[in-house]
Amino acid sequence: SRGLGDVYKRQCTGGLLSSLITELPGCPSFFETSLVTYSNKSKIDFLGVKKKTISQYGAVSHQTAKAMVMGLISKTKSDIAVSITGVAGPTGGTKKNPVGTVYFGIAIKNKNNAKTYKKYFSKKNRKSIQSNSAKFAIDLMYESIT
């Protein structure tokens, strides 16, 4: 079975996912890299997300989540990568992406595509949205390797 030799990119969770992963015993054997690319500039500079993608679709979108995770998987030796971008609140929501809207990207090394998912977490509490986002990302990774 594939290891989690992975990379994680988070926007709305601010590092919570890697914090949860590093609580696991033996994590150095499967955890490689974690990036918090909170700003659009860092998404562009570190992950290679195109400015046009962000300007056309927004930082919180399927397209940006996919570009983020494809950038991660191409720049690392990880077997699996996940991206999270969303609106954790309490402000920043829009009609299209209200507070609680989160997009996830997941990619497996040597596959030429990534899957994206959109989730809406109805609790408007920032901490709850972040926690639920991190847990959903863990579930995505687990499902991808089993």
Where are these regions (language model features)?
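Short alpha-helical segments enriched in small residues
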Residues: 2, 6, 12-146
